[in-house]
């Protein structure tokens, strides 16, 4: 149930019937203040201006053409030409009943698409650090939202599994195996990488072997490929533990590393040359883009093949876009990476389109995000200034949540307490990030994120358990409850029912724009509206028809909160 879409469709048809152009947009939005209705159509003035008409007169014409009798109890023209729409409470009650009794609340996209989502993308032989958190959890929330709406989602974990460093890493893995080292030493990937680099820098014989392994690996040598695969597998096994702790849906099957595109690169570069897009410059192959200027105001050069024959990230990203369209048959490809990658992605995709590798209808979207900062406003680091490992961050979250929950509640069993601690710990880290507009930097603050007040995971999780507890206190017959209907008798019930019906609008925005904070804001507002309803509308002490109706509103709120948090990858618990 997407009220915004229903109203937009009806008002757009009426605008066209009243003389507006076919592409006129009604710009229907949720109203910010009750006196202006539940929804407003703000596109009337723009359409009237194009027609040379008085906006209020045109608004009147539109209202004469539109039939909202089943949906709205009244409409009014406000200000210079806004249309305010007040929803009919009986229609709202019926829609809320339908949402409660329909799988997925009846939410389903009319036009399912195949969507590739490129997210997380850690490097092989290195441990995941806090810098991987945002891509991993934002990408996953968007993947869940798109899937929930009925799209076919292909997760693409674009891991850094290729490059000259692999000669060094293979040679060091071989050295360790020859020395019969315990495989457990590889549990610390950072130490492994550092030791390999140190050996490479200080042992010329080792360095010669490492360089020879680079060449062998790139030419498909079986031994080097086997050793390389071991490194990839060991890394991804460790990453998988992080994904599982984070309640992220990525698996080893979703790995589509840089190496996947290697076979495509020579042909792409050759084709760019043939088309005259890539030209030789000082031995390298460069594509000059008029759309980007260097500091002298000349077209910017983007290297696609180095002087030594090596390929670059740009070449790989061109290949990835081509692969996602031609091989995966995607309609959209979304990449979740740091804002600092924005120009790089724009250039790679511009070359992709200039070369004709994908049609204009194929949507290539870079969903960029800002940095995670410490309280000092600088990039988040350890006290000694080092990179914070993701596993260490999650461990600290559990330690802090343990102290918090032990202070709050001793009535839980040990098993229940462990579940609450894990849900609150991981949920707090994720929600603190997901609730911020992804395009901005944000300050990582343990005290704020673990608070039971405000727009936080603990507050949302507690709101859910409070509603669950209502059903533990009632002896209402489940058959009687399912047979009952929602009836709206006052403004608090009406406000809650309308807010519940706006769930799809929030999910749809996340799916379209890659903005999970919209869903967080919606859930927080829903919890607030429910709290006000609960305060003013007694449930358990109400008379039977009223009690059943209010219980159904509470049940729909419970389901919506649980589903909404699940789309964010945040666990709920039955008791807190």
From Swiss-Prot:
Subunit structure, as described in the record: Monomer.
Record-linked CDD domains: Anticodon_Ia_Arg, ArgRS_core
A cellular component annotation (GO) from this entry: cytoplasm
Protein family: Belongs to the class-I aminoacyl-tRNA synthetase family.
PANTHER family in alphabetical order: ARGININE--TRNA LIGASE, CYTOPLASMIC, ARGINYL-TRNA SYNTHETASE
A Pfam short name: DALR_1
Lineage per the UniProt record: Bacteria, Pseudomonadati, Pseudomonadota, Gammaproteobacteria, Pasteurellales
Catalytic activity from the UniProt record: tRNA(Arg) + L-arginine + ATP = L-arginyl-tRNA(Arg) + AMP + diphosphate
InterPro entries hit by this protein: aa-tRNA-synth_I_CS, Arg-tRNA-ligase, Arg-tRNA-synth_N, Arg-tRNA-synth_N_sf, ArgRS_core, DALR_anticod-bd, Rossmann-like_a/b/a_fold, tRNAsynth_Ia_anticodon-bd
Motif 'HIGH' region boundaries: 122-132
GO molecular function, one term: arginine-tRNA ligase activity
Main subcellular location of this protein, as a coarse class: cytoplasm
Keyword terms: Aminoacyl-tRNA synthetase, ATP-binding, Cytoplasm, Ligase, Nucleotide-binding, Protein biosynthesis
Chain segments annotated as transmembrane: none
Enzyme Commission (EC) number: 6.1.1.19
Xref: HAMAP family: Arg_tRNA_synth
Compartments where found: Cytoplasm
One biological process term in Gene Ontology: arginyl-tRNA aminoacylation
EC category: ligase
Species annotation: Mannheimia succiniciproducens (strain KCTC 0769BP / MBEL55E)
Protein name, per record: Arginine--tRNA ligase
Keyword Aminoacyl-tRNA synthetase among record annotations: yes
């Amino acid at each position: 149930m997407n009220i915004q879409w229903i109203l937009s469709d009806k008002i757009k048809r009426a605008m066209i019937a009243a003389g507006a152009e076919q592409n006129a947009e009604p710009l229907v939005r949720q109203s910010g203040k009750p006196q202006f209705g539940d929804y407003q159509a703000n596109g009337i003035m723009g359409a009237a201006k194009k027609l040379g008409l008085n906006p209020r007169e045109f608004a009147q014409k539109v209202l004469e053409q539109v039939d909202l009798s089943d949906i709205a109890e009244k409409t009014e023209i406000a200000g210079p030409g806004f249309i305010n729409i007040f929803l009919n409470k009986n229609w709202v009650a019926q829609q809320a009943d339908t949402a409660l009794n329909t799988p997925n609340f009846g939410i389903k996209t009319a036009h399912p698409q195949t969507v590739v989502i490129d997210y997380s993308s850690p490097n092989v032989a290195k441990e995941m650090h806090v810098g991987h958190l945002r891509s991993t959890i934002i990408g996953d929330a968007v993947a869940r939202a798109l899937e929930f709406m009925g799209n076919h989602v292909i997760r693409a974990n674009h891991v850094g599994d290729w490059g000259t460093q692999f000669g060094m890493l293979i040679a060091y893995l071989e050295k360790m195996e020859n020395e019969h080292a315990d495989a457990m030493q590889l549990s610390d990937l950072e130490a492994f990488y550092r030791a390999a680099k140190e050996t490479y820098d200080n042992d010329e014989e080792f360095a010669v072997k490492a360089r020879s392994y680079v060449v062998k690996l790139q030419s498909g040598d079986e031994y080097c490929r086997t050793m390389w695969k071991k490194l990839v597998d060991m890394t991804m096994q460790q990453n998988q533990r992080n994904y599982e702790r984070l309640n992220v849906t990525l698996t080893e099957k979703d790995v589509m590393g840089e190496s996947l595109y290697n076979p495509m690169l020579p042909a792409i570069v050759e084709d760019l040359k043939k088309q005259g897009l890539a030209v030789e410059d000082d031995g390298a192959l460069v594509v000059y883009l008029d759309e980007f200027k260097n500091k002298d105001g000349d077209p910017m050069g983007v290297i696609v093949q180095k002087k030594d024959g090596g390929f670059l990230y740009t070449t790989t990203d061109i290949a990835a876009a081509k692969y996602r369209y031609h091989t995966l048959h995607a309609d959209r490809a979304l990449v979740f990476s740091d804002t600092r990658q924005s120009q790089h992605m724009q250039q790679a995709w511009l070359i992709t389109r200039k070369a004709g590798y994908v049609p204009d209808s194929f949507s290539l979207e870079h969903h960029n995000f800002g940095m995670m900062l410490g309280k000092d406003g600088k990039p988040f680091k350890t006290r000694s200034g080092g990179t914070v490992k993701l596993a260490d961050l999650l461990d600290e979250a559990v330690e802090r949540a343990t102290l918090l929950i032990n202070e709050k509640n001793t009535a839980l069993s040990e098993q229940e307490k462990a579940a609450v601690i894990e849900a609150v710990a991981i949920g707090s880290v994720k929600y603190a990030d997901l609730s911020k507009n992804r395009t901005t930097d944000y300050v990582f603050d343990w005290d704020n994120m673990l608070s039971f007040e405000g727009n936080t995971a603990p507050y949302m999780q507690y709101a859910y358990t409070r509603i669950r507890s209502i059903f533990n206190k009632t002896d209402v017959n489940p058959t009687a409850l399912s047979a009952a209907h929602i009836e709206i008798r006052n403004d608090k019930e009406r406000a809650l029912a309308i807010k519940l019906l706006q769930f799809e609008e929030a999910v749809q925005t996340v799916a379209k724009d890659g903005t999970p904070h919209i869903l967080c804001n919606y859930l927080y507002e829903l919890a607030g509206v429910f709290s006000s309803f609960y305060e003013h509308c007694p449930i358990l002490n109400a008379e039977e028809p009223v009690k059943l109706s209010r219980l159904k509103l509470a049940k729909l709120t419970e389901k919506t909160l649980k589903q909404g948090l699940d789309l964010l990858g945040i666990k709920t618990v039955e008791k807190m």
